[in-house]
Amino acid sequence: MVKQDPRDKSSYSPNLSIPINNQEEPTLNNNNNNNNNNNNNNNNNNNNNNNNNNNNNNNKNNNNNNIKHKDEENDFEDSIYQIAKEHEGEEDDEYFPIPLDELMPNHENDELTKKIKQTRPEDKTGLYVYCRNATYTVKHRENKKVKIKLLDDVSFFLRPKQMTLILGTPGCGKSTIFQMLAGQLKDKHFEGELLFNGHPINHKNHHRDISYVTQDDIHVPTLTVKETFRFALDCLGKKELTREEKQVSVDNCMKLLGLKHAENTLVGDNFIRGISGGQKKRVTIGVGVIKGSNLLLMDEPTSGLDSSTSFEILSDVKKFVTYGYSPALITLLQPSVQLTSLFDNLMIMSKGKICYFGPMNRALGYFKKLGFACPSHNNPAEFFQEVVDAPERYSFIHPPKCKTSDDFVKAYRESDIYLELMEKMDANKDGIVDDNKPKVLVDSTAKELGMYPHGIGYQTKICLKRGFIMISRNYYNFATRVFKGIFFGLLLGTLYWRIGHNQSGGMERFGLLFFIMTTIIFSSFAAVNSFFGERKVFYSQKALHYYKTGAYFISSIICDIPAGLIEVAFFGPIVYWLANLRPVFIRFVYFMILLFITDNLSLSFAKMCAAISPTIEIANVTASVILSIWLLFSGFTAPKNDIGGWWIWLYYISPYTWIFQGLSINEFTYQAYGCKDSELIPPRTPQNLLPYPEGFGGNQVCQYTSGEQIMDAFGINNPDYFKWIVYAILGAYIVFFYSVCFFALKYLNFEDKKSKLAVKKLKKKKKVIVCKEDEEPNCKVTTEALERVSDDNDDNADISNYDDDTVIDMKSPLTSPNYNNNNNLSGSGNNIKRRKVKTPSTLSPMVNSPLTNLSPMVNTPSKNGNHSKQKPISTSQKDISSETGSYLQFKKLCYAVDVKADDPDNPKKKKSQRLQLLTDIDGYVKPGQMLALMGPSGAGKSTLLDVLAQRKTGGHITGEILINGKPPSEFTNRIRAYVEQMDVLPPTQTVREAIAFSARCRLPPEVTKEEREIFVDKIVEVLSLSSIKDLKIGVLGNGLSVSQRKRVNIGVELASNPEILFLDEPTSGLDSGDAFKVIDVVNKIAKVMNRTVICTVHQPSAAIFEFFDQLLLLKKGGETIYFGPLGNQSSVILDYCDKLGMHIKPHINPADFVMTLADEGKMVEGPNGEQEHLDAKKAYFESNICKKEYEIMEGQLIPDDFVVKTYDSRFASSWMTQFRALCMRSWLSRLRRPAIFVSNCLRSILLAVLLGTLFVRMDYEQKDARSRVSLLFFSFLFAGMVAIGNIPTTVLERGVFYREVTAGFYHSTAYMISYVLTSYPFILSTGILYIIPTFWIAGLDSGRHSSKFWYCLFIFIITYIMYDAFALCLAVCLPNEVMASTICGIGLSLATLFGGFVIARPNYPSAYYWCHYLDWLRYPLEASCTNEFTGLTFVCTNNKGAVPIPIIENGVQIAIKYYCPITNGDDFMLTYGFHKFMRYIDIAAIFGYIFIFVGLSFWGFKKVRWLNR
C-alpha cells in the first residue's frame, strides 16, 4: 500500500466547520460527509454517461466555489475578527500542555529542587523584561541603500519563574531578540522601549545579570569537562565564592547535566578525541548557566540531543527557573510535546514580527479560532512552527483565512490576547508586569558594578593556569619542536662541522647564520594556523565577557615562551658548538638570547597576521609574502651593497636585517681569518706566475684577513657594540607586532562579519533585489535567476496519471486544481490517512514514467473553466527513470569493532577486545517502501545504515545481505546511492551542474545527451531547486542553506537513477518546515518513482513519521525491539504498544512515543492495572507482528515476474566520458576560484617587479656574478612557496573525491589525470608572469636568438610543475592540511640547504653528497645557472671588485696589480660544482621527480583514505 502525503486534508475527520458566509450553517455531522464521499465514490464507478454528469456537476460546484472564494477574499479585512468573536467561548485543549505534575512527578521535593532553594540568595527576584514597540534596522550587506528590519514593532514581557519558548523559521528574528536582550545590539539602530526591572539597559554590566547559552559548541579542546566548567566559573562567578564552593558548584552542574562520569575526559575537536557531540552540547549549556543569573537566554540548546536527554536537561532548567526565580527565553528547533509543555508562554515569529505571544495553554485555542486545527497525533510545537509558513496544511476553512505571515500578524494584533497584552503593558509602564510586584528589585544601572567580577590580575592568573594546562596536554607540539631542534641542530652542526677561520669558512659562516635564523623563523611561523583555532574560542568567550582582552593576551604571550625556549635550548647549543662558532661564553649567551628573541619576534608577527586576517588563507598568503620580502632584503641573498637606492628602505625596515646583523657581528668581530694555500689570490697558474707586469710574479695575498672585512663584503659595517642595540630594535618590533595584534583582537571580530547569506551568482552582477528565501533572509538573487523560474513552477508538483480510478496529488488537496470544496469543507485536520494507489505495474505507460509525472503539466482551460490534463512536455524521448527499485534483505546481521580497554590483570596496560555494535538484525525493504531506522543515541542506526550500504572500512561484519535475492557484488554501486549526513558537495559548481555531473558519470552510454538533460531538469523540478539551479553551492555558512544543500545532495545521488536510496539523518540541523520539505522529496522518490528507501531519522515529527511504511527500532547495544509496518496514522505500531500496556495520549508525537520502547527500565501497565517491567526485545519476538514479518522474509519476498538487472562493469560510463566530465568540472572549479588564481598572479607580478628591479639590468661586474645566482636561487624558492598555497584547496576537494569515488562516480585515475592536467595552464600562467618580467628587467643573458631565454622559461615551468606535484602528493597522502603544509615547509627548507647555493657542492662533507644529489632544487638551479653563465665574461671595470695584489721583488713592493677573481662564467660555475654537460641530464632529473611525485599522488588517490567508518 502506498501512503498518502501527510498534507492531504481530504480524509480529515471534521469536528468543526466555519461558515463561508452568514447564511450558511456550520456542518457538524461527520456521517453526512462520509455518506457524501461514499456516494461520490459510487458515482465514479458508474458508466461514462454518469461520469459526464458528475463532471458537469463538479464543474458547477467549482464555479460556485470560485465565486465564494472571490467573495471571501474581498471580505478578508473583517473575517478574522468575526471568526475570533464566533468562537470566543471555545475551551482550550484539555490535553495540551501536559500538566507539570505529570511531566515531572514530585518535582517540588526532589534533591535538585532542594539544592536550588538552599543556594538561592534570599534577596533574589530575577529580571522583569519589558519590551514595547521594538524595531531594529540594519543596512543590506550588498545594497547599502536598502534597509532591513530585523525586528519590526515587537512587544512582549518576561517575568521570573516563567519560561518562554520562541518558535519560527530561520531568519525570523529569533537570534536578534536574543542579541537585543543580551545587550549586543547597537543603540543607534534600535527604536522602542526596553526595560530590565524598570530601568534601561546598562551595557557596561548588563551581561552580569544574564546567562546566554549560544547554539555553537566552541570550547578549548585540550581541557577536560571539569576544567572547562571550572574556568567558566572562575571567570564569571562572584568574587566572594570560595574554592570549596566553586568545587561544589562544578560537581552539581556536571551531575545535573549527566557529565560527572566524563569529568576527566577531554572536550576534544576534529583532531583530538574527546566527548561526544551530545555531551559537548551539555558542556555548552553548563558553562552558560554555572555562574547563576537573573535572566536565562538559550539559543537552540538541544540541537543534536535525543528527546530523552533534551527533556532531562530542560526539565532541570525548568526547576532552576521556577525555584531559582529567573525568567528564561529559549528557542528550539524541533521540540517534542513534552518539551513544549514545560514552557509557560509561547512566542511565534516570522520576518521580524510577532505572530503570537501569549500563554502556552491558550495557543491551540487561539489558532482554532482563526480556522487552524492541530491534528490529534501531531505535536503542537510543530503545528505552531508550520502553521504560519504552510497554513493550507492545517486550515479547516478553504481557502485559509490567513495566507501569509502578515495576515497572521494582523490577526494577532486584532485578537483579545494582544489587547490583553497591551492593557497589561499600559498598566505597568514601570516595566514590572506582575500582579505581585516585589518590593526590592535588582538594578544593575544603579549599582557601581564593574564590567567584570574580577580584576585583570586575577583574570590573567586564571588564563595563565588554563594556558599551562593546555601546554601540558599539547605534548605533540613540544615533541615536534624538540625533535626539530635536535634534528636541525645535528644536521647543521655536522654539515658545517668545525668550520675553519679561512676564506671558505668565512663565507660558509654567513650561510650557516642565515640558515639558523630561517630555521627559528619557520618554526614560529606555524603559529598562524594554531592561533586561528584559539581565536575562535577567544571571540566566543570575549563576547560572553569571560575576561578582558589584555588578560588573555598577556597570558597567551607568557604561555608561548616555554615552547620556543625549549626548541632554542636544544637547537642553539648543538649547532653552535658542533659548527665551531666563536668559543667565547658571552658570545654564546648573546647567540642564545638572540635566537630566543627571534622566536618571539616571528611568533608576534605570525599572531599579528592571524589577528588582522579574516581567513586563514589570507593570513598565510599575507605572512608568506611579507616574510619572503623581508628574508630577501635581510642582507644575505641580496647584500646591502647590491641593493639599489629605490629598495634600500626595505633593507632597513626588515626585522631580519637586524637579526642577521646581530648574529654576524657576534660571530665576526675581532676575529682573524686566514687562507689555505688553495685560497690565496691569484691562484698559482702559469699565467699568474709570469713576472710583472705580464703576471703577478708568484705574489699571492689572502683576500680577507679579519671578520670585519668579510662583514664589509656583505654591507655590514657596524661596530661590535651595535649588537646590543639590535636587542632594542628587535624589542621595538615585538612591541609593535603585539600591539597591532592586541588592538585587532580587542576591536575586530571576523566571526561576526562572516557573511552567512552570500549565495553568489556565477555570472557578472545583474540588478540585485532583496528577497527572503525559504531558508535564508536577505539573500542576493539576480532578477535573471528569478525570471528563469516559470510561473507554474511549484515546490510540490501535481502528479496524476490518466486512469480515472487513481490520482496521486502531491499537493495539498486544498490548493489542487482538482479540489472539491464540498467534500473537503469541513476537514479539521484531526486525522492523517493514507490513500490507496495502484502499483506501478498496473498503471498506464504514462504513469510508469515517474519523473515525467513529477514535471509540470500543461493545463488547458476547457469551455467550462476547468483545466483538463494534457500529456507532459517532452515525452518523445524514452524515460530513463522508469525502472523499479530493488528488494533488500538482511539476516542475522552483526557488526563489531576492536577497541582498547583496561586490562583487569594489569591496569597500566590496554587490552584489545571486541565491542559488539549490532546483534542479529533482520529485516527487508520492498520497492516503493520507506524504512525508518530509529533508536536512541548509541543504538547503532548509522552503523546499520553503513553496513547495509557497504560503507564500513573496518570492523567485523557477519550475517547476510541480499539484494534481489543475491549477495552484493562489485557492481552493486550501480543500483544504490547513499546520501551522507554531512553534505560534502563541490563548492564551485552550481546546483544544476552538480546534478548533471552525477548523471553524466553514472548513467549508461545508452542514454543520449538530450535524454540526460531532460532527466536532470526533472530532478531539479522535483527537488524544488529551479529557483536556485544556477547558484553556486558554496561551503556551509557561505553558500546554500542547510535545507538547500540537503536537497542538492539528494539530487546528486538521485541522478544515478538508483534502485536503492540510503539516507543518513537527512533532517539533522533543520527546523520542522525544512525537515518536512526534505522528507517530502524522499517520499516522492519512493512512492512515485517506486524506489527502495532506507533512512535513519532523529526525532521525526508526526507528519514526517507518517511518510514511512516500515520501522526498524533499535535499542542501545544494537538489538531489534521492533520491525514491522507503521500502519495508517501509525495505527499498527500504536496498537502493538497498546497491547504492551503503553497508551498514547492526544498531541503526543507517535515517533517520540514509540521511542520510549527503547528506554531502559521501561514500566508499563500490566493486565490488572499494575506497573510491570517491559522487556521490549522479548515482547517483540513473541508478538504476531514478528511472526508475520519473518514469514514474509522466509517466504517468497520477490515476485516471480520480477526482472533482476545484471551488470558487467563497475561504472555506468566509460573512462573517457568520466575524464571529460572531470576535466570540465576541474577547469571550471579553478576558474571560479578567482581569488586564488588572481592572488598567485599578483604575487608573481609583485615579486617579479621586486626582484627584477632589485637586480635591475645586471652588468658583468664581479658582484653581478653572485647576484645572478642569488636571483635564480630565490626564484626557485618562490616556486615552492606557491606550491604550499595549493595544499588547502586540494585537501578541501579531497573530501568530495572520497565521497564520489566511494559512490562509484568514476575511476580514481580519471580524477587524478584530469586534476593534474587542468592545473598546468594555471601553473604555466603563474610561471610566465614571474619569469618573463624578471628575466628582462634583471637583464639575464638571452643568448643567441633568445635561446637562453626559452631554455630558462622551460626550466621554470617544469620546476613549477614539479613543486605542484610535490604539494599534491603531500595533500593526498597526509591526513590533513596542517601536517601537509608542515612537511612541505620542512622539505623546502632541506631543499634550500642542500640545493648548492647556501653551501657549494665542493664544500659539502663527503657524508652529505648523497643529500645534495637527492635534492630536487639542485637540478633546476644547476640547469638555469649553467644556461645563464655559459659563454659569459665578467670584468672589473676601474678595478671595481678586483683584489689588489702587492708586487714584491727582493723584499720591496714595487707596484700594486689588481686581480679580477671572476672572468669566465663556466669557471665560476665550477666553484658551485655545476657543469655545463649536466644541463640536459638536469631536465631528465626534474621529469623524474615529477614522475615520482605524480606516481605517489596516484597511489594516494587509489589507496589512501583518511576517512574511516
Curated annotation (Swiss-Prot):
Binding locations of ATP 1: 168-175
Gene3D superfamilies from the UniProt entry: P-loop containing nucleotide triphosphate hydrolases (3.40.50.300)
UniProt record similarity statement: Belongs to the ABC transporter superfamily. ABCG family. PDR (TC 3.A.1.205) subfamily.
Listed SUPFAM superfamilies: P-loop containing nucleoside triphosphate hydrolases
UniProt topology in membrane: Multi-pass membrane protein
Name of the protein in its database record: ABC transporter G family member 5
Domain named ABC transporter: residues: 129-376, 888-1141
Annotated Basic and acidic residues bias: 1-10
Record key words, sorted: ATP-binding, Membrane, Nucleotide-binding, Repeat, Transmembrane, Transmembrane helix, Transport
PROSITE patterns attached to this UniProt entry: ABC_TRANSPORTER_1, ABC_TRANSPORTER_2
Principal subcellular localization: membrane
Transmembrane segments annotated in the record for this chain: 477-497, 512-532, 557-577, 583-603, 616-636, 643-663, 725-745, 1236-1256, 1271-1291, 1320-1340, 1352-1372, 1379-1399, 1481-1501
Gene Ontology CC annotations of this record: membrane
Residue span(s) of domain ABC transmembrane type-2: 472-748, 1231-1504
Region (Disordered): 1-70, 813-881
Binding site for ATP 2: 935-942
Skewed-composition ranges (Low complexity): 29-66, 813-831
Pfam families to which the protein is assigned, alphabetical: ABC2_membrane, ABC2_membrane_7, ABC_tran, PDR_assoc
Localisation per UniProt entry: Membrane
Single Gene Ontology MF annotation: ATP binding
Example GO biological process: sorocarp morphogenesis
Bias (Polar residues): 11-28, 839-881
